[in-house]
């Protein structure tokens, strides 16, 4: 739930009001390998919440979880969190739709 991220940001800012905040490893696993519209919606919703919080708090960075599909300690290779698909047999990388969305968002919002 995106509002949970806002709640966490507000909680941390109460304990460290003068410290810059960085959101790290925010993302979700998606069942679809390349076409991951659910992940794009997840990022849109969560970034909207981060933008609202940044109006009043010193949020300095946001990092997606993760660039590449990888080995997760608790889940092994079963869940894919990356915005780049990795074929574990061949190591071939393929940009997912979420990668392309991030790319267009960064270009669109660059100063």
Sequence positions of predicted segments:
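Non-catalytic scaffold segments within catalytic domains of secreted glycoside hydrolases
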Residues: 1-111
